[in-house]
Amino acid sequence: NLMSLVTLLEQMKAHKVHNIVFSSSCTVYGQPTPEHLPVDETAPIQVALSPYGNTKQINEEIIRDEAHADKSLQATILRYFNPIGAHPSAMIGELPNGVPQNLLPFVTQTAIGLRKELKVFGNDYNTPDGSCIRDYIYVVDLAKAHVKAVERMLSGTALDQVEVFNLGT
């Protein structure tokens, strides 16, 4: 994740490309404090809970540093909250052959009878029943958000040189 972003930014500079939409993650928020729930873009970045989250934090910092050094760089950072689903064409999104990597395919496989039961793990979350609460975004909405981010940069209506948007429910 890190070196590929640095290489991309170097190539953008070499070829005079000044706009980037970066796919980040809600994992940059770490474990949000209760006063910052629900999480919005003003919530502080906390210690990442995974190496993946840490790389996203570092990537965002690299983008901010590069924008500070190069005033022609315009960046939009999109922080995803659990992308789910697939486009009807199956060109984007999940097509879980084998063991899915997240909960929703298990839910749908159970609903149509491919699985006998649905097991949800974890009962010690800070919620009334101890279960996990998750935010999701449909992959088609995610694709539309990328288009909107590019349109916003190209139209000159961005409010800051680096803008951040959360994408979830």
Predicted regions and their residues:
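Structural/interface elements that position substrates and couple domains in central-metabolism enzymes
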Residues: 7, 168-169
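Alpha-helical substrate-binding/gating segment
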Residues: 83-86, 105-127, 134-164
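Alpha-helical segments that scaffold the active site and NAD(P)H-binding pocket
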Residues: 10-11, 64-65, 108, 112
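Residue(s) in the substrate-gating loop at a strand-loop-helix junction
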Residues: 25
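Residues at the N-terminus of a long alpha-helix
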Residues: 41, 47, 132-135, 160
